[in-house]
Amino acid sequence: MFKLLTITTHGIIATSLLSLVFLAGCSNSKPTIQDTETNAGGQTSVAPAGRAVAKQNMALVRFLNADPGTTRYDLWFDKAKTYTNVRYQRLTPYDELPATHGEFRLRASGWDDTEPVAIQLGRLESGKRYTVVALRDAEGNMALDVIPDNLAPPSNGKAKVRVINAAFEFGQADVIRQSDNKPLFTGVNVDTATDYKDVDAAATTLEVREGGHNRPTLILSAVNLKAGKMYTIVMTGGTASTPLQAIPIEDELTQGVTLGL
């Protein structure tokens, strides 16, 4: 989806935790009336319209492992194991889960009888979409963020972009458009997701910088932001053993509308 260039830096300082809280009513997005297509990690998946799954009192949930290393994870929702053996940087397709108050639990793959390494409580709303991210917080502890996916289309001729900062040792991040040095996002804290933002649809190069600094740590080249599409840039790594990396996710509403709405 785009090319990465990592620039070595020294003296990276972690910021204090600003964790996301998964609560009822935290999402203002409406269920989509169209199916969605997702491209991530070279794989494409399709999910039904939000309004279609709402008729069954279900929500749409996908899982991303943003914890650098070799550990693969299983994710549970209440008593059901919903995703298994998910490796680092892998994004699962959307799956339908009950729209209810419940508990997400994260375990190393295959360790079903052990205590979870992270827990997140909250409510899934009928017909809405969520990305659950396994990451480390600013103190290096495993955590789960349940992030609403507002896949309402961007303005005419625009693309939408958001950033998730899962690089726990990197600290605050700025994302800058290289061509005109325009900040798209500033001061994105660790363990935080921005809202989607409308941007010009164009091929561009983006720089990721430590908050308030002028020198890029990561350059994202050949970023082709297409009109009507929605992009998530997940920052991860940035440790002594794993360089700062970006996991790109591309979503779009398909032309077809699910029947039975």
Specify the residue positions occupied by each region the protein language model found.
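Intrinsically disordered, low-complexity polar regions and short flexible loop motifs
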Residues: 26-261
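Sec-dependent bacterial lipoprotein signal peptides
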Residues: 1-24
